[in-house]
Amino acid sequence: MSLLDLNALNDLPKVERILALAETNAKLEKLDAEGRVAWALENLPGEYALSSSFGIQAAVSLHLVNTIRPDIPVILTDTGYLFPETYQFIDELADKLKLNLKVYRAEQSAAWQEARYGKLWEQGVEGIEKYNDINKVEPMNRALEELNVKTWFAGLRREQSGSRASLPVLGIQRGVFKVLPIIDWDNRTVYQYLQKHGLKYHPLWDQGYLSVGDTHTTRKWEPGMAEEETRFFGLKRECGLHEG
C-alpha cells in the first residue's frame, strides 16, 4: 500500500504543499467519483470519515462513499438551529443508508450561547464567524481528533460558489487529507445520480431552497440570486468548516 506522507506534507508551507499534490490531483481529475474514493482508501491513511451537513444534495456523497466504505463514520456538526425538515432528513437517510452517524455539538447549548453573546448571526460578519467557530469549527476539530481521522471526505462541488470554484480533488485541511470526490459534478449529474439510486433531495428543495443550513441564516432562492447569496445574508458562503 502506497501512502502519501501526511506528516511531511503538513511540514511544508501551503503553496509548496499544493504543488506537491499537483501531480496526484492531475491523476484524480481523470477518475470518476467512485474511482477517487477507491483511490483514497487505497493510498491515503486511516482513519477515514465523511462529513455532511445533510443539505439539499447530501444523499449523493452519503450514498457514494458509504457504499464503497460501509460503516464509515459520518460526522454531523449540529448547531441546534437546523430546520425540522433537516432533522427528519437526517433520520431518514441514517436509516435508509445504515449510516454510522457521529453527531458533534458545541460545548455550550444554543440557549446558553444566546444568553452569553446574544444572537451572534445578527452581529455582522464578525458575529457570524464567531457563531461558526463555536458551533461548526470547534465541534469538527474535536470530531477529527476523537475519531483519529487522517482522511476526510466531503461533498463540496465547484459549481456551488466562487469560494469553491478552484478547489482540488485532494487537499490538506486541519492537518488531515481532504478528498472531494464529486467536486467537478454539475447539478445535472447530481440529479441523475439521485434518480439512478432512488434517492431524494432535502425536503426543502421543493419549497425553493437551493442551500440549507441554520433556520436564521438560510433564505429561499429568488430570481436573480446566486446560490451562495441564500446563506448568511449574502455576507459569506462558508460556515468555516471548509476554510483554512
Swiss-Prot record:
One of its GO terms (cellular component) is cytoplasm. GO terms for biological process: hydrogen sulfide biosynthetic process; sulfate assimilation, phosphoadenylyl sulfate reduction by phosphoadenylyl-sulfate reductase (thioredoxin). It catalyses: [thioredoxin]-disulfide + sulfite + adenosine 3',5'-bisphosphate + 2 H(+) = [thioredoxin]-dithiol + 3'-phosphoadenylyl sulfate. Pathway: Sulfur metabolism; hydrogen sulfide biosynthesis; sulfite from sulfate: step 3/3. The active site is at C239. It is found in: Cytoplasm. Pfam families: PAPS_reduct. It comes from the Bacteria. Keywords: Cytoplasm, Oxidoreductase. GO terms for molecular function: phosphoadenylyl-sulfate reductase (thioredoxin) activity. Its EC number is 1.8.4.8. Belongs to the PAPS reductase family. CysH subfamily. Catalyzes the formation of sulfite from phosphoadenosine 5'-phosphosulfate (PAPS) using thioredoxin as an electron donor. This is Phosphoadenosine 5'-phosphosulfate reductase. It comes from Enterobacter sp. (strain 638).
